[in-house]
Amino acid sequence: MTPTAELRTKLRKLLDEQIPAGGSDADTRFLDTDIDELLNEATNIYEAAATGWTLKAAMLQRELGQVESYSVGQERYDMRKLQDMVNYALKMAETYSRMAASSMGSVILRIQPPEVL
């Protein structure tokens, strides 16, 4: 697919990686060049989203690390479990992968007008 501003915006929505107000693409997990690469390699937007969610699962693993909770004195902090976040990202990738498979791509038809007597 050829990346356009509209496709970038739609893919960011599907990946839940929208640019914050007053921010830039550097404020998200995917730069515009990353989004363009996903779009270039995909046959449709859902295939790009599936690949993006798979990459996002790996990013979450790196970002969250292995710490699930810690305490400082009387205070205790519990974080979202890494496995839950990774499972969610992979489930989203699977959902978009199924949508990509069932989505009809572009079709080119050639119609020849009938001969009229």
PLM regions and their residue ranges:
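Conserved short "hinge" loops at termini or chain/domain junctions
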Residues: 1-47, 94-117
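Short, surface-exposed, charged amphipathic helix/loop patches that serve as local interaction elements
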Residues: 17, 43-64
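Flexible domain-boundary/linker segments
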Residues: 28, 65-69, 91
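Amphipathic alpha-helical coiled-coil segments with heptad-repeat character
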Residues: 43, 50, 72, 76-79, ...
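Small-residue hotspots
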Residues: 49-50, 57, 86-96, 100
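Short E/K-rich amphipathic alpha-helical oligomerization segments
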Residues: 58-76
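Extended, charge-rich alpha-helical interface modules
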Residues: 78-87, 91-94, 112-117
